[in-house]
Amino acid sequence: MYKAPVEEIAFTLKHVAGMGEAISKGLLGDLGEDLVDAILAEAGRFATEEVAPLAEIGDRQGARLIDGEVRLPDGWRDLYRHWIAGGWNGLTAPEAFGGQALPHMLNVAALEMWNSGSMAFALAPTLTMGAIEAVSAHGSAALKDTYLEKMVSGEWTGTMNLTEPHAGSDLGVLKARAERRDDGSYRLFGQKIFITWGEHDAADNIIHLVLARLPDAPAGTRGISLFLVPKFLVNDDGSLGPRNDLFCHSLEHKLGIHGSPTCTMIYGDGKFGGEKGAVGWLVGEENKGLACMFMMMNNARLAVGMQGVAIAEAATQKALAYARERTQGRAPGASGAGMSPIVEHPDVARMLLTMKALTQGARAISYACAHAIDMSHRAGETSRHWQERAALLTPIAKSFSTDAGVDVASLGIQVHGGMGFIEETGAARYLRDARIAPIYEGTNGIQAIDLVTRKLPLSGGDQVKGFIAELKQIADDVRRSNLDGFGETAVRLDAGIADLEQATAWLIKTLADDKTAEALSGATPYQRLFGLVLTGSYLAKGGLAESADGAAENRIALCRFAAENLLAETAALRDRVVNGAASLAAARILLA
């Protein structure tokens, strides 16, 4: 059974991601380490004692569409009510609407634990938090006053409606339409697919944020508007009014996250009588909806990265517990009679340490991204720097962490051997749940394109160059520490950072020479190269914080393992970035 790693999470936040320094400088208001510890402890308790025990039944039963209504798995409605009672939905929401306005770092740490308990359940608050952010930033005063308080409390949930059958990654071709009405409202018509928690029985109302096109809108992405469309209309006194003209047509039958209802939503079908068209209100300006939605999408990408971290952590815990109990054969050098626990066999130990290193590296990257988001709002004159740092880290956090979630979950099955292939052990669920994360909220391939074409050029390339300089400083700090436990860590970090620096310089020059196809041929290898170097660097940073807690020896040992094993990939990845385009172009004849 999963147990929230509260101490490890707190350590990473404070001593690796930057929260401790931000608190000491007063950049996080009245927030102190004692309050941080208390919030993390209670979030961990909720994940361990309330969410995790219901994950299996959620996977087994799944969400069900019965007589036009979506029913959640047994126990999940009560679980959601407990969630509301705990006030968790409003951790980072504005205080004016009942939120706590706490740092984003705390929220993503809590999200990690809840996703480890059940990724399918945690998707509901994740989407609602994103909707709150979008309405807070772009909604009119009337929309905020009508909807935000109930969304912040969790009484009403939120969704994000982008995808259509023919419009996935390319939203410029979406066909959902909106028509103006004289009272300032709009009527929406169309179909949206893959809508997470689009319909369910846990909340009184569901607030859909829907992308649609006005009749006179420009073509492409410049003609997309964003609308708030509630399941139930809201009366002037705040009470619920009639059912809006929208419904869930069907639920998808998915590989994983079975407890999360993934809906096909129909708008404007006239199913409930009256005038056709789902009533909605404009969020932001007409034809500028994609910019409004991107705020929600960017933070959702980090939240999805946390899903990868969460699955990796839970899968690692399960595999390690099994490896300590399962006995097979005799490990080399084993003393005494009888079989050895498989954790003592070198190859099993290698797999488990790889799982641990990838998990902790992905956690540190994601928390560092959240720290940059917080500093972009709180750091005064340096806010622009932190805004760019958050932009640079977001695609890496999303892609590296979700790839790690899949890789670690797969290794977890391998550690279990044949039992891992049996559903009853629970190891397979982690892989089934993890597999969606590299796909949604922008595929990891799209994240790589974003990283290379939009994020490397920030400040003329100075942002990424400055970041690499910071990583070099970590390697120097390891070298000067003279701690034997680090082994060859400094040397391997130097080599990995040099590979990253060379690949970065080549990509920036290749883009400047207008050779976009060549640059994008190596975008995904570059993204992994960056993630691995960050993993080694952040694990080293944790190892250097030797006085922070009593686990310094363990942290240094894991750092050394990562540096001397995982970072061995960086040279090959650099070569794929710099030299892979020609062979890719030549081999495309095989795809014709």
Task: Please annotate each region the language model reported.
Residues M1-A122, T146, R576, A582-A592:
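Amphipathic, small/basic residue-rich leader segments at the start of a protein or domain
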Residues M1-S24, G274-N287, K318, R324-E325, ...:
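Acidic, low-complexity proline/glycine-rich segments
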Residues Y2-K3, R180, I257, A368, ...:
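Alpha-helix capping/hinge segments and adjacent helical runs
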Residues L27-D30, R60-P73, E286-A303, Q317-M355, ...:
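Glycine-rich cofactor-pocket loops
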Residues A63, W76, P125-T128, G139-A176, ...:
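Internal maturation/activation junctions in enzymes
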Residues S185, F189-R243:
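A short core secondary-structure module
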Residues F194-T196, L233-H249, K254, T264-A300, ...:
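A glycine-rich, basic-preceded beta-loop-alpha segment at the flavin cofactor/substrate interface
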Residues L458, Q473-A592:
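C-terminal amphipathic alpha-helical interaction region
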